[in-house]
C-alpha cells in the first residue's frame, strides 16, 4: 500500500474524532460514517430476457467516512461520476444510503429527515428554477410560504435576506432582467430564507464570467461563511474556488474517498512540492549540482524576461528545505531575485491522487 493510501485509511479512521482543520476539538456540522450507495445498472431488453433474475448494481459511494466542522468551508473534488452529486442528494435527504450513517447538525438523514431539512439547504445553481416573470421579492415570498412562514414574518425575512445578498435595490425588478451573477445571489437568498446552518453548493460560479465569479466568491467567503457563519460544502472543478474558499477538501473517485486535507498538505503528501527560482544564472553549475546530489528534482527553465529566467524544480521537505536550498545557492554566488512555491494545478493534484490510489490498490 502506498504512503498516501495508508494516510487516507488513517484519516478515515480518525475523521469522526478530529474533523477540524487545525486538529483541535470542534463540533460537527456534517458526519459521514461508512456511507455506501449503489444503483441498479440499466440493461437492454435482450440482457433482461437472457438473465431475467439478474439484478446488477453499480456502486456510487463506497464506505465514505468524513466529518466537517461547524463553520467550515469544505470542498468536494473529483472527476465527473465520482459520487459528489449523490453525496449531496443524500445529505439533502433525497437519496437514502444502503449502509452507514450520515448526520447533519446532529440529525440522522434517514430517521430525522425533516429536522435535517430544517438546518440544511441545497443551492441549486440552475437559474431556471427561479420564476423569471416574478420579482426578486415575489420569488422569495413564494418560497417562504412553501417553507411554512406566514404573515408579517415573510416580509421581514425577505427584506433581511435581500440585504444579505446585496439585492435590496432590485427587489421589485423582475428576475428575467437580472444578470447571471444577480440570479446566483437570488438563489443563495432563497436558500437563506429558512435560516439554514449548512449550505450545499454545486459549482455555483460555472455560469459566471471571470470577474463576476471572483466577486461572487468574495461574497460567499465574507458574507455567507464569514458573517452568516454557515457551514458550506462545495462541489467544484474550479481551482479558484478551492484556493480562495475551502479550508479543506476531500477527493472522491468512483465513490471512494481517496484523501482529505488542504490542497497544500495533499500536494506535500504526494511529494510534489514545486518551486520557482528567478535568476540571471539559469545555467549556473550550482543548480546542476543540486540535481546531481538529489536535493532537487529535474530543472525546467520557463522563459526569459529582461535577462531573468524562471527555473522550476521539485523539492521535498517543505519551507525548511527550501530555505536551505536558497542559502546554498547564495553561497555559490547564484543571483536570486525571487524563490517561491508553485501550487500544483488542481487538475494535476486530483489526477495524481487518483493514480496513486490506483497504484496502491494494484500493489496491495
Go through the PLM ranges and name each one.
Residues 46-47, 141, 145, 152-170:
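Conserved ABC ATPase "signature" region
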Residues 195:
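Conserved catalytic motifs of ABC-family nucleotide-binding domains
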Residues 199-203:
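Catalytic Walker B motif of ABC-type/P-loop ATPase nucleotide-binding domains
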Residues 214-228:
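Helical segment within the ABC ATPase nucleotide-binding domain
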Residues 260-261:
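ABC ATPase "signature
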Amino acid at each position: 500500500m502506498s504512503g498516501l493510501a495508508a494516510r487516507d485509511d488513517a484519516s478515515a479512521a480518525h475523521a469522526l474524532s478530529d474533523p477540524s482543520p487545525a486538529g483541535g476539538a470542534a463540533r460537527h456540522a456534517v458526519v459521514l460514517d461508512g456511507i455506501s450507495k449503489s444503483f441498479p445498472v440499466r440493461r437492454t431488453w435482450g440482457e433482461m430476457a437472457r438473465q431475467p433474475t439478474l439484478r446488477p448494481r453499480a456502486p456510487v459511494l463506497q464506505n465514505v467516512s468524513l466529518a466537517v466542522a461547524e463553520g467550515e468551508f469544505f470542498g468536494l473534488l473529483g472527476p465527473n461520476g465520482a459520487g459528489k452529486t449523490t453525496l449531496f442528494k443524500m445529505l439533502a435527504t433525497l437519496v437514502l444510503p444502503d449502509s452507514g450513517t450520515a448526520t447533519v447538525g446532529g440529525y440522522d438523514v434517514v430517521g430525522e429527515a425533516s429536522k435535517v431539512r430544517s438546518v440544511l439547504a441545497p443551492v441549486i445553481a440552475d437559474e431556471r428554477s427561479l420564476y423569471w416573470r416574478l420579482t426578486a421579492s415575489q420569488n422569495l415570498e413564494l418560497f417562504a410560504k412553501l417553507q411554512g412562514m406566514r404573515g408579517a414574518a415573510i416580509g421581514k425575512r425577505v427584506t433581511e435576506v435581500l440585504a444579505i445578498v446585496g439585492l435590496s435595490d432590485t427587489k421589485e425588478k423582475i428576475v428575467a432582467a437580472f444578470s447571471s451573477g444577480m440570479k446566483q445571489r437570488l438563489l443563495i437568498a432563497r436558500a437563506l430564507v429558512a435560516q439554514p446552518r449548512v449550505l450545499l453548493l454545486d459549482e455555483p460560479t460555472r455560469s459566471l464570467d471571470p470577474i463576476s465569479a471572483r466577486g461572487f466568491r468574495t461574497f460567499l467567503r465574507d458574507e455567507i461563511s464569514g458573517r452568516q457563519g454557515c457551514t458550506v460544502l462545495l462541489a467544484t472543478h474550479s481551482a479558484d474556488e478551492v484556493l480562495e474558499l475551502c479550508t479543506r477538501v476531500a477527493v472522491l473517485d468512483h465513490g471512494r474517498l481517496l484523501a482529505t486535507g488542504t490542497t497544500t498538505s495533499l500536494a506535500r503528501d504526494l511529494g510534489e512540492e514545486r518551486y520557482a527560482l528567478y535568476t540571471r544564472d539559469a545555467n549556473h553549475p550550482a543548480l546542476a549540482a543540486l540535481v546531481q546530489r538529489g536535493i532537487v528534482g529535474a530543472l525546467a527553465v520557463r522563459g526569459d524576461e529582461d535577462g531573468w529566467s524562471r527555473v522550476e524544480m521539485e523539492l521535498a521537505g517543505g519551507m525548511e528545505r527550501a530555505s536551505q536550498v536558497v542559502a546554498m545557492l547564495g553561497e555559490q554566488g547564484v543571483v536570486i531575485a525571487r524563490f517561491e512555491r508553485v501550487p500544483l494545478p488542481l487538475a494535476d493534484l486530483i489526477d495524481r491522487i487518483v493514480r496513486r490510489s490506483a497504484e496502491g490498490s494494484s500493489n496491495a
